[in-house]
Regions:
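Short, structured segments at the rim of ligand-binding sites
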Residues: 1-435
C-alpha cells in the first residue's frame, strides 16, 4: 500500500491540463464491443480503473493497439464468450465497477452477457436493478447466482420498447442505450440520465451508425439498426478533476489556470463554487482562479444558511460534494452539505475534524460546515483514503494544512487522478509518493 507524504501550507502557481473524463471513458471504452470494425478513442485517462477495463477487454479478445499515451485503437472482431464464465474473468471484473458496462454491448451483439457483482467505491448502496430492469423490458432473461454473486443475461433477439426508469442512473442509462441500438424496432427511453458522459456516448454511437435522437434530454428515441461500424471519438475533459482543481486553488490561496475545460459541459459547477465565495474567471476555454486571501459563503436571500446538494444532471454532481465540503472548512460562514444520492460519502469528515475543521455530521446524508475563515489553519495528520473523491479531498486539505500529513491507501486516488503528485509538484507542492 502506497502513501503520500505532504508538507502543506505552500501557495501554488501555474497551469493544469485536465485529463480525460473517467466516467465517460468507462462507458465509451465498452462501445467497441458493438462492432467488429476498428474504433479509435483519444484523451483516455491513464488511471487505474480505466487501465483495468482496457486489460479486461483485451483478455476478452478485443485487439487493442496503443497509438500513444491516451489514444488507443480497439477492434472487437473475435470475442471469447467462453472466457466470460471463467474464474479469471470473475476475479478481474469483480475488482472494477465499470465492468458492468460490458453487459449491454455483449447482450446486443451476441445475445448474452455475464458479470460478477462489481467492485468500486464503498460509498453506499449502488444497486444494479436499473440495468437489468431495462434489459428485461427489451426482452432479455436475467439470472443471478447468489452463491457465486454472478449475473447472467441472455436474449435471442432484443426488441424496442418503452422504458421509464425509476431512477436516472448514469451507468444504467449507458448500458441500456448500448443494448437498444441493435434492438429490433424503436425504443422510447424516459427518465434517462443526460450527463455530458451520456451525451458523448450517444454522439459516439451515432457516428458508428446508431440512430439516437433527444440527446441531452431525459427522453431518448433509439431506432434499432442491424449493425454498427467504426469511428473516432475524443473523450471530454474530466469535470470532476476541474472542480477538484478549483477547490485546490481556493484552499491553498493559489493562482491557477485550468486549461481546455470544455466550459459548455460544466453546467452549474462554476457557479456552485462561486457561491462559496471563490473567484473564478472564464478565459476562452480556460478557467483562471486568482489567489484569494479569503472567501465568504453566500446565504439564501432570506439570510438562512446556504444548502448545497447533489442531483442528477443538470444538477450538481455528487462526485464534487466532498470537494465543496473541504473548501468550506476555510471559508467565512457556514453551509449545509446534503448528499442525497449516496449514504456513505460523508464519513471521511472525521479525518477533517481531526485536522481541526468544524463540521457537524447530522446524519449519513448531511453535514454542516462552520468555516474557520482562515482564523485557524488545518493541521497535518496521518489518514487513510477511503475512496477516490474523499481521497483527493483529504489531499487538498493536507496541501492547505500546517505541517506534515501522510495519506495512506493512495491507490484509491490513483483510480481517478492521473499523475496527481507529479502535476502538483509542477505547481510547487511539497508532495512525494512513498511505496
Amino acid at each position: 500500500m502506497s502513501s503520500f507524504e505532504i508538507y502543506g501550507g505552500k501557495k501554488l502557481k501555474g497551469e493544469l491540463t485536465v485529463q480525460g473524463a473517467k466516467n465517460e471513458a468507462l462507458q465509451v471504452l465498452c462501445a467497441p464491443l458493438l462492432t467488429a470494425e476498428k474504433v479509435t478513442i483519444s484523451n483516455i485517462p491513464d488511471i487505474v480503473d480505466v487501465n483495468k477495463l482496457i486489460d479486461l477487454l483485451q483478455t476478452m479478445g478485443v485487439k487493442i493497439e496503443k497509438v500513444e499515451r491516451g489514444t488507443y485503437v480497439f477492434q472487437a472482431k473475435d470475442i471469447d464468450l467462453t472466457y466470460l464464465e471463467t474464474e479469471d474473468f470473475k476475479k478481474r471484473a469483480a475488482s472494477l465497477r465499470g465492468s458492468i458496462m460490458i453487459v449491454g454491448p455483449l447482450l446486443a451483439r451476441f445475445g448474452k452477457g455475464f458479470i460478477p457483482k462489481p467492485g468500486g467505491d464503498k460509498i453506499g448502496r449502488r444497486r444494479l436493478d436499473t440495468h437489468f430492469d431495462g434489459f428485461a423490458l427489451l426482452g432479455a432473461k436475467f439470472n443471478y447466482d447468489a452463491g457465486e454473486h454472478f449475473y447472467s443475461i441472455e436474449a435471442k433477439k432484443l426488441k424496442g420498447t418503452y422504458i421509464h426508469l425509476d431512477e436516472a442512473s448514469v451507468t444504467g442509462t449507458a448500458n441500456i442505450i448500448m443494448a437498444a441500438v441493435l434492438a429490433e424496432g424503436t425504443t422510447t427511453f424516459y427518465n434517462a440520465a443526460c450527463e455530458p458522459y451520456i451525451q458523448q456516448l450517444c454522439k459516439m454511437l451515432n457516428s458508428m451508425g446508431a440512430k439516437i435522437s433527444g440527446i441531452s434530454s431525459n427522453l431518448l428515441t433509439i431506432e434499432g439498426v442491424k449493425e454498427l461500424g467504426g469511428c473516432y471519438h475524443r473523450i471530454l475533459p474530466d469535470m470532476i478533476e476541474i472542480g477538484s482543481f478549483i477547490g485546490l486553488a481556493a484552499m491553498t490561496q493559489s493562482e491557477i489556470t485550468i486549461k481546455d475545460v470544455s466550459w459548455e459541459n460544466l453546467g452549474v459547477i462554476p457557479n456552485t463554487f462561486r457561491r462559496l465565495g471563490i473567484k473564478l474567471e472564464r478565459r476562452g476555454d480556460d478557467i483562471y482562479i486568482p489567489a484569494q486571501e479569503s472567501y465568504e459563503i453566500d446565504t439564501f436571500i432570506d439570510g438562512s444558511i446556504l444548502t448545497i446538494y447533489d442531483a442528477p444532471w443538470p444538477g450538481f454532481t455528487p462526485d464534487l460534494l466532498s470537494i465543496i465540503l473541504v473548501v468550506a472548512t476555510q471559508a467565512k460562514g457556514s453551509v449545509l452539505i446534503h448528499q442525497k444520492m449516496f449514504e456513505s460519502r460523508l464519513f471521511f469528515t472525521d479525518k477533517l475534524i481531526d485536522m481541526g475543521a468544524q463540521i457537524i455530521l447530522c446524519d449519513p446524508h448531511r453535514a454542516t460546515v462552520i468555516g474557520l475563515g482562515r482564523q485557524h489553519h488545518l493541521r497535518g495528520i496521518q489518514m487513510t483514503s477511503p475512496d477516490i473523491r474523499a481521497g483527493v479531498s483529504l489531499l487538498i486539505a493536507a496541501l492547505s494544512a500546517e505541517g506534515k500529513s501522510v495519506i495512506h491507501n493512495i491507490e484509491q486516488i490513483d483510480r481517478g487522478y492521473q499523475d496527481i503528485d507529479i502535476r502538483l509538484r509542477n505547481l510547487g507542492a511539497d508532495i512525494r509518493r512513498i511505496n
